[in-house]
Amino acid sequence: MPALYSVDDCESLTTKQVHGLYKDHVNKSQVSLMTSFGFGQELVESAEGVWITQRDGRRVLDFTGGVGVLNHGHNHPRILAARQRFQERKSMEVHKTYFSPYVAALGHNLAELLPGDLNMSFFPNSGAEAVEGAVKLAYKYHGGRRSRVLRADISFHGKLLGSGSLTGQNQSGFQFPGIPGVGIFRYGDLESVRTLVAELRTDKGESDVYAILIEPLSASTMNECSEEFLRGLRELCTAENIVLLFDEIYTGWGKTGTLFHFMRYEGLVPDILTTSKSFGGGKSSISAFVAREPVFRKAYDNLTDALLQSTSTTYYGFGEEAVTAIEAVNVAVEDDYPARARDIERILAPGLARIAKEYPDVVAEVRGHGALHGVFLHKGPKVLELVTKLVPGAMTKDPRFRTKLITSSVVNALYRDHGIYTYYTLNGDNPLMVAPSLVAEPHEVEFFLDCLDKTLAQGLPRLLTRFVKEKVSSLW
């Protein structure tokens, strides 16, 4: 008999054993990287709300928001109950040729909540799949007669071959092949888009662009499109019959203070919206692309395409995933998650502004909305010179390595000294992200601000030196 681990066995594995299994069967380098941080040397016993309890009994305040997944916090009781009810009823998961009441209801709920005629939904499993499904829909809408798709230079739409080629930030430094016909415009620059659209014409003088993708707020860089840009983009796409896609995979379900970020601008409606992450309530791997009815019906409302075979996945619309999303959406609406995000912002924004003013040599800028903010740290000559001295030259081949190291030193200190779990983005200027779940209480936000203040008071040189000496030098 092969020596297989059971679920019970997993729950009794030590940190050392888990590291060993990762080295043998997952990725040895991942162990080297993650053990640079304190949380890479611990295992989690449980998680609830915004708190993580480790095996050693230490409680950690989670201010990552699950990188967009945990608007509802860890293990929301209503979501757990919905999943348990589905399981106890022994409901059917796979609805391929049976109709699913859950898919039907979920599609209805999205249509009720979204503006205009965003009425038609499809439910893949990940954000990247939703983006690719949306792009396919746009291409099919034009019958394959147009060949160009446009994305911004600042963009993150996924890591599959298709969605990866529509992403402006290359996190690995290795270039994979992608879909043909991708054009690039400057984020937030309407004239850049207009110029590109004007250049991309067929021999008949018609537009050759089938879709334009944009993130109204880029959660990976904390850049934001202006209302003027988004409305101008909508006007241009309408005039040229180009399908306009808004990617709100991270920023949806109340995170920035409105149900979706674009909804702060009355009357603004994309042709297709993508969503995922907190759409699954922190327990379900589900996404959606939601299309305006005329766009969807022209592409797929016929017997040949009725099952969307060109874009469907094995697990699309899976029973328990759809049930979880239904409950997640209802919780977000009934508990008014946009208002919760605004309440968090009323504490967080002035608190971060005060810290930035108090430590001008440490904090360069703070940007954000609702419960999603980026703290950009100074990377002046003195700090970069210190990084160069502390770190072996071979490790600086990554052009962003120095900035990552600076932010990592703050992430590590917050965890080590105060039991606060944070992260930094791998794109742009690698800001420290402050992105609590929307169930965070005011006193928890205040506690975070107090701990960030105490951490930054030490100064970047001290934080950097400590981080490198404690963790990095032992590995390199």
What residues fall within each predicted segment?
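Conserved N-terminal phosphate-binding loop of PLP-dependent enzymes in the Aspartate aminotransferase
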Residues: 2-476
